[in-house]
């Protein structure tokens, strides 16, 4: 697929895809569809549903939009009582939990093939986000990612001509970007890292800030959990990766100590910092401010692979009561296939999603757009999924990052304490799955 792939070609692909599988031809059914797209993305979703209903006379989808948290609270009881919706969107941080509790039904290879859903059309790690114990439970409809925003004007002023892609390049560029309020640079006599006028990179102390540490750990060959799904983010690979990030503050003085996301966001908007790693959801904000900025994939801080954090939403089929209408399940799979075709995914990117598949990332509508700077590596985005106790792992991990970044604890001590706390919580959580 070339970079000149157009929407017309995508529509042609959709038409071919529709002919490649046996479309639903059963009796007319009505599907209930529960999702949490309640913001600016809601009108886009409603438009897609209207298009589906208009082109599928024997399938009518009735959608209900409500806050994600409400769905997480209600879904177990709905499944247990046999009143589950036909299709539910579940996010990456919740899906493994619902799968492990038996609230979501697996999608067999035969079902996916019959519905025309080809796993290969999606980015591999994104599709596998909804896999568990070798089975698939969902199809991705939406994706977001942790990226690096960079200020082109400040980089030019500081003589930086290349967006860093490696650890060494990041450190060199960050040092070049950093100046204290007296005009001194890192390494010069009298340099004051506690009073910076401009600085190289934004680090901060909340869960979003910790996702850079997560990326660095994966890049270095580490992981949040081990094969037994116990916390393991204090491995030597993890300690080394996080130590580099903390050293950007404590050793090199190219990032502000103990800062917040809000403070760093404001500083980037004001042209004070060269590199602002965060969620791609700030794209519209920076474009609205008419900033001269770019978007790049997270530099490879580790030595093993490219990796960045990603969030995603997946179309799933909840477990239904005995005697559930098989026609409804076939129709629901038809709906899932249609919603995740290239043409629909291209439309969905209007709501702020990243492309979920290379065919859409190659569309010419993205040419010249800042966000296209990450498209070559969308296959290296990894969600924090695959273990049922995400909260029990991520809460202590986020706290460990905050303690290490702020200097309250050494990196190793912070990660060790985080793993200890996470595993205590996991031990308790395991009892609820027995």
Where are the language model's segments positioned?
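Extracytoplasmic/periplasmic substrate-recognition and gating elements
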Residues: 54-55, 60, 156-158, 243, ...
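Extracytoplasmic/periplasmic solute-binding protein
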Residues: 133-141, 146, 171-230
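Short, well-ordered beta-strand elements
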Residues: 27-38, 59-64, 87, 137
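Hinge/lid segment of periplasmic solute-binding proteins
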Residues: 92-147, 188-197, 212-215, 292-297, ...
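Glycine-centered hinge/linker elements that transmit conformational signals in sensory
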Residues: 173-175, 227-258
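Long, aromatic- and glycine/proline-rich binding clefts that accommodate carbohydrate-like moieties
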Residues: 121, 125, 296, 349-403, ...
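Short, solvent-exposed loop/beta-turn-alpha elements that line the ligand-binding surface or hinge
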Residues: 105-122, 191-195, 199-205, 222-241, ...
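Extracytoplasmic "Venus flytrap"/periplasmic binding protein-like
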Residues: 47-122, 131, 153-165, 267, ...
């Amino acid at each position: 697929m070339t970079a000149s792939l157009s929407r017309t070609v995508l529509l042609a692909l959709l038409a071919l895809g529709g002919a490649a599988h046996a479309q639903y031809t059963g009796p007319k059914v009505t599907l209930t569809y529960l999702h949490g797209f309640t913001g600016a993305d809601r009108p886009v979703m409603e438009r897609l549903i209207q298009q589906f209903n208009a082109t599928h006379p024997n399938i009518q989808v009735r959608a209900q939009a409500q806050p994600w948290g409400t769905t997480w609270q209600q879904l177990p009881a709905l499944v247990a009582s046999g009143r589950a919706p036909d299709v539910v969107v579940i996010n990456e941080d919740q899906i493994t939990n619902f799968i492990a509790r038996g609230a979501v039904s697996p999608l067999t290879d035969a079902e996916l093939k019959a519905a025309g859903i080809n796993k290969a059309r999606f980015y591999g790690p994104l599709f596998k986000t909804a896999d568990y114990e070798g089975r698939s439970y969902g199809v991705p409809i939406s994706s977001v990612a942790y990226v690096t925003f960079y200020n082109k004007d400040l980089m030019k002023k500081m003589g930086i001509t290349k967006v860093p892609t490696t650890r060494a390049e990041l450190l060199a560029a960050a040092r070049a970007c950093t100046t204290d309020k007296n005009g001194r640079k890192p390494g010069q006599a009298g340099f004051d890292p506690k009073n910076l006028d401009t600085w190289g990179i934004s680090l901060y102390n909340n869960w979003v800030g910790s996702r850079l540490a997560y990326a660095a750990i994966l890049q270095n060959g580490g992981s949040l959990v081990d094969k037994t799904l116990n916390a393991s983010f204090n491995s030597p690979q993890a300690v080394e990766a996080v130590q580099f990030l903390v050293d950007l503050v404590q050793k090199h003085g190219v990032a502000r100590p103990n800062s917040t996301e809000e403070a760093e966001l404001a500083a980037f908007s004001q042209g004070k910092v060269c590199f602002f790693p965060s969620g791609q959801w700030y794209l519209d904000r920076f474009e609205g401010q008419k900033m001269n900025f770019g978007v790049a994939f997270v530099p490879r801080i580790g030595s093993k692979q490219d990796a960045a954090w990603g969030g995603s939403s997946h179309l799933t089929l909840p477990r239904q009561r005995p005697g559930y209408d098989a026609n409804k399940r076939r129709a629901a799979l038809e709906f899932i296939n249609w919603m995740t075709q290239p043409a629909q995914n291209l439309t969905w990117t209007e709501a702020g999603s990243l492309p979920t598949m290379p065919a859409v990332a190659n569309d010419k509508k993205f040419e010249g757009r800042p966000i296209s700077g990450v498209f070559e590596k969308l296959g290296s985005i990894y969600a924090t999924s695959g273990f049922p106790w995400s909260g029990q792992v991520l809460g202590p991990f986020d706290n460990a990052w905050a303690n290490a970044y702020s200097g309250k604890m050494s990196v190793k001590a912070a990660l060790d304490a985080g793993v200890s706390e996470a595993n205590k919580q996991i031990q308790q959580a395991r009892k609820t799955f027995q």
